């Protein structure tokens, strides 16, 4: 089957159409803006899969309806999913704008004095607002000379932020969320909302019973040679942790081997269900070889599977990581307990950064007073105001140990195309695989156990659905924290020390939900959250605006907030603007 092509970014150079001197004097400068924009994006961006982003420039500058239509025809034939219109001069507003209502769009009006690029920008944005097709405004802070072909830093930041978020929108459109199973233990996020996926994300939901996973394992609907490779890889790389089960629940060596084999098979089969596997077609299993075109998935597990079969912890953790027995590769997005809304937050984070995501319970707020009472030691540094314990038995990516290193040698989580095999091995070496606790998981399994290094910047996010309002997004930028070993051991032992831990300290503002760490925990909208590497809350805000998802909680500096220009017409309070604009325009793919 032909592989679906990646979305491209279309660059639209627009120009004053008056011939006999005006247009001719602007052709080169206008087209150079388009070429510079394309070069910037091509150099500095990649798709989440690691492929270079392609830009498509209109064949000619656009002065009116005819050239605009010719540009649209070219873009339609080349899978353009995002557009950036550029100009250094006055042009004819509504005659030259991109009118596709579902395609993210921005306009860069050159800040120069010779020609009124700012005037076109304002006129075009007014047309967008009047027609109900929001667009992002890009206008440099400082005046440039007409022959200056450089892109100022503030313009570059907006171009790249818009492009990252726009490509995320385009990449999700037409894909599916694979729901393996149904509702897990009454968790609301696993009550998968088809309307949300269809209307806000442009995605479908593929619902598959967990018996399909059972069938694939039992009937050997997988690559048997790959299974042997996966087992050999696990034998080489897995370190096993303490078995905390009572003696009557401990498994013997043969039973543990069977659990490991099934856990790896679950990873293989869920992957094949998501993206397909041509090896299955070679076995005559053509239907199964196609997969479900899934860009994200969730596995119910508890309790209808886990009371009898090995849990999904190993499968989920490996799929969400940037490496496995096939080497370093793009992480998948698989939500434990089929929490589709946390899965969407994971999907957003992966699409924006290309990195693996940490899925976790937002489990416990530890106040400085409580920590000192329990451990006899005081919190300090980033942790001085308290910490949140992020921990879950399931799908935290092994990258979350933060054994990868940035250019300064600091711990981080890299995009998969930057990860070396040595860094992947270091993450594996920092992970123990602990037998699942029988009281929770009667069918057994292995949970990954690691501790995230401290001082790493993270952004915690979550999507929630509110009846009568729709989806909302929560964002909390902060840092991982490294506690003294004795303190960590005492606190960790009070929950489940066989699971991966990240100690998280959000950045406080002294206001609202970020008054203190307790308020962050108290205002979090669900039991799960996602950690994405870096302080990238501004990118999430831009993406949410494109999808018409209001942000109900964030601690991003106001200067970094970048939304369509029409948001400013929805009141004077910046967050109220967001709610009113999202309500006014409705979901991007409204039905």
Curated annotation (Swiss-Prot):
Keyword annotations: Carbohydrate metabolism, Cytoplasm, Fucose metabolism, Isomerase, Manganese, Metal-binding
Pfam family, one: Fucose_iso_N1
Cofactor(s) the protein requires to work: Mn(2+)
GO MF terms held by the record: arabinose isomerase activity; L-fucose isomerase activity; manganese ion binding
Secretion signal span: none
InterPro entries assigned: Fuc/Ara_isomerase_C (IPR004216), Fuc_iso_dom3_sf (IPR038393), Fuc_isomerase_C (IPR015888), Fucose_iso_dom1_sf (IPR038391), Fucose_iso_N1 (IPR012888), Fucose_isomerase (IPR005763), Fucose_isomerase_dom2_sf (IPR038392), Fucose_isomerase_N/cen_sf (IPR009015)
Keyword Metal-binding in record: yes
Record's subcellular location: Cytoplasm
Pathway(s) this gene product operates in, as recorded in its UniProt entry: Carbohydrate degradation; L-fucose degradation; L-lactaldehyde and glycerone phosphate from L-fucose: step 1/3
Reactions catalysed, as given in the entry: L-fucose = L-fuculose
EC class of the enzyme, as a word: isomerase
Keyword Isomerase: yes
Catalytic residues identified in the record: 337, 361
Binding site for Mn(2+): 337, 361, 528
Family: Belongs to the L-fucose isomerase family.
Job of this protein: Converts the aldose L-fucose into the corresponding ketose L-fuculose.
Name of this chain's protein: L-fucose isomerase
Organism: Salmonella paratyphi B (strain ATCC BAA-1250 / SPB7)
Lineage: Bacteria, Pseudomonadati, Pseudomonadota, Gammaproteobacteria, Enterobacterales
Gene name of the encoded protein: fucI
């Amino acid at each position: 089957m032909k592989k679906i092509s990646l979305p491209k970014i279309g660059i639209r150079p627009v120009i004053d159409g008056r011939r006999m001197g005006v247009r001719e004097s602007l052709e080169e400068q206008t087209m150079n803006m388009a070429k510079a924009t394309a070069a910037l994006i091509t150099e500095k961006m990649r798709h989440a899969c690691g492929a270079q982003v392609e830009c498509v420039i209109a064949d000619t500058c656009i002065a009116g309806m005819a050239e605009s239509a010719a540009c649209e025809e070219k873009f339609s034939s080349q899978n353009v999913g995002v557009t950036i219109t550029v100009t250094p001069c006055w042009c004819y507003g509504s005659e030259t704008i991109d009118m596709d209502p579902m395609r993210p769009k921005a306009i860069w009006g050159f800040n120069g004095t010779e020609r009124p690029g700012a005037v076109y920008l304002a006129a075009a944005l007014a047309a967008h607002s009047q027609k109900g097709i929001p667009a992002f405004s890009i206008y440099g802070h400082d005046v440039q000379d007409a022959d200056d072909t450089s892109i100022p830093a503030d313009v570059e930041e907006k171009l790249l932020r818009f492009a990252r978020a726009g490509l995320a929108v385009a990449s999700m459109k037409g894909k599916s969320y694979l729901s393996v199973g149904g509702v897990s233990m009454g968790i609301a996020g696993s009550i998968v909302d088809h309307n949300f996926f269809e209307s806000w994300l442009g995605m479908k939901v593929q619902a598959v019973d967990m018996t399909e996973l059972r069938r694939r394992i039992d009937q050997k609907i997988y690559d048997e040679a790959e299974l042997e490779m996966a087992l050999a890889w696990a034998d080489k790389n897995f370190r096993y942790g303490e078995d905390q089960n009572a003696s009557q629940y401990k498994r013997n060596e043969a039973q543990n081997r069977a659990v490991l084999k099934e856990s790896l098979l679950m990873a293989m089969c869920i992957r094949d269900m998501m993206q397909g596997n041509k090896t299955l077609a070679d076995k005559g299993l053509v239907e199964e070889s196609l997969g479900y075109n899934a860009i994200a998935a969730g596995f119910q597990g508890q309790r209808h599977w886990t009371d009898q079969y090995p849990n999904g912890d190993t499968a989920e953790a490996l799929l969400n990581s940037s490496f496995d027995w096939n080497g370093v590769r793009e992480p998948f997005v698989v939500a434990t307990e089929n929490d589709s809304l946390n899965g969407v937050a994971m999907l957003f984070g992966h699409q924006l950064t290309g990195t693996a995501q940490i899925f976790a319970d937002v489990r416990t707020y530890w106040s400085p007073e409580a920590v000192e009472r329990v451990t006899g030691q005081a919190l300090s540094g980033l942790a001085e105001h308290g910490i949140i314990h992020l921990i879950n038995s399931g799908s935290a990516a092994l990258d979350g140990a933060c054994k990868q290193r940035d250019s300064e040698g600091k711990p981080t989580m890299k995009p998969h195309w930057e990860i070396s095999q040595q860094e992947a091995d270091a993450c594996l070496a920092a992970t123990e695989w602990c037998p699942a606790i029988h009281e929770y998981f009667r069918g057994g399994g292995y949970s990954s156990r690691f501790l995230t290094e401290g001082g790493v910047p993270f952004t915690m996010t979550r999507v929630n659905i509110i009846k009568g309002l729709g989806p909302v997004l929560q964002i909390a930028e902060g840092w991982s924290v490294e506690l003294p070993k004795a303190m960590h051991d005492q606190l960790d032992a009070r929950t489940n020390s066989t699971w991966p831990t990240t100690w998280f300290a959000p950045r406080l503002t002294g206001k609202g939900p970020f008054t203190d760490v307790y308020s962050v925990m108290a205002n979090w909208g669900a039991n799960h959250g996602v950690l994405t590497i870096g302080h990238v809350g501004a990118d999430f805000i831009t993406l949410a605006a494109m999808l018409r998802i209001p942000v109900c909680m964030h601690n991003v500096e106001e200067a970094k907030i970048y939304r369509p220009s029409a948001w400013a017409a929805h009141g004077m309070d910046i967050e109220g603007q967001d709610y009113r604009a999202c309500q006014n325009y409705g979901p991007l793919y409204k039905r």
